[in-house]
C-alpha cells in the first residue's frame, strides 16, 4: 500500500519535472530563436545602412549634376529686366546678327523688350546672337531686306548693310539694293504698322570733307562714281527716302550718322583700320599704313554707339544726329598705340595712298550732347584692350580648326581700300 503511494508520488514528481524541463527547453528554444531574430535584424539593419550608404554615394554625383543643370538652366541667358506689357516694346533689328546689331540686340534684350533680329548672314553671324536663341523675348529670322517683311513691331532699327570696304566693294550692286530697296521695304513696313524707324546712316555721307569737324548741316564732298560710292551714295539715298516718307506719309524717322566704331564681334578681316592693325600686330605682321599716316580718324567703342542709338530712337529728334567720338588721332599714332597695347614687335609698313581716302574725319557731337544727353564714355585704350582680347580668342578659335566666316576680298581694279 505504502509502496504504491510512493510510486504515484515519484511518478507525479517526474511528470512535473518533465513538464518543467520541457518548459525550460521551450523557453531556451524561444530565447534562442528570439536571439537569432534580433541578431539577424541587427545584421539586416546594418546591411541596409551599408546599402543605403552605398546608394547615397552613387546618387550624390547625380544629384550634383542635376543641381548643375538646374543652375545652368537658370543662368542660360544674360539677366533680363522685367517690363510690364505697357512698357515692353516689340523691336525689329535688321542686320541684328552683325557687329553693331548684335550689341544692340544685347542691350534691348537686357532692357526687357521683345526683339526680332532679321539678317541674311552676308556679313552677320549667328553665333553673335546665339546666346539669346530660345528666349521667349527673342526671335531670329533669316531674311533679306530687299524682300518685303510682314511683321507687327513698334520700332525698327534698320542696320542692314555691308559696312566695311571689302564687303561692299565685293558686291556693290547688292550694297546699293540693300540701302535703297531694303530701306524702302522697311519704311513701307513702318508705314503699315505705325512703327518708328531709325536708319543707321554713316559719316561716309560727308565723303572727303572740306569742313572739319563735320556737323550735321554739312552736305558733304562725295565722289558719286568712286570705288566706295555704292555705300556712300546708298546711305545718302536712304536718308532722302526716310525724310520723303516722313513728309509724305507721316512715318516717324530717326537718322544716326555713325562714325568709326570698333569692339568685339568685328570681323577679323573686314578691312577696317582697327581690325587690320590688331590682327597684324597679333600675328607679328607689318602694320600697313596707306600714305604718310597723317590722315585722322576718331574711334568710338561699340557700347557707346549702342547707347546713342537707343537714346536717339526714344528721343523727339527727327533730324540727322552724329554719333561718334570727337577724340582725334592720326592713323600712324593709332598704329603705334595698338602695337604697344599688343606688345608686338611688328614694323609699320607704308604703302601708296588709297583712292578717295578722307584726310580728316571727326564728328561734331554738340547736337547729340544737347538733345540726347549723349557722349562717349569708354576711354580709347580700355576699348582697344577689349577688342584685342576678343581678337586673341578669335585666333585661338581659328587655330582649333573651327570655321570662322571671312569676308571675301574686294575686287578693285584701281586704287586700294582706304582707312575706315
From Swiss-Prot:
Give the result of residue 204 to A, as annotated: Reduced UDP-glucuronic acid decarboxylase activity
Major subcellular location class: Golgi
What is the topology of this protein in the membrane according to its UniProt annotation? Single-pass type II membrane protein
One annotated GO molecular function is: identical protein binding
Binding residues for UDP-alpha-D-glucuronate: 149-150, 177, 185, 188, 191-192, 245, 248-249
Reactions catalysed: UDP-alpha-D-glucuronate + H(+) = UDP-alpha-D-xylose + CO2
Q: What class of enzyme is it?
A: lyase
Write down the required cofactor(s).
Answer: NAD(+)
- Its protein name is UDP-glucuronic acid decarboxylase 1
What is the organism of origin for this protein?
Homo sapiens (Human)
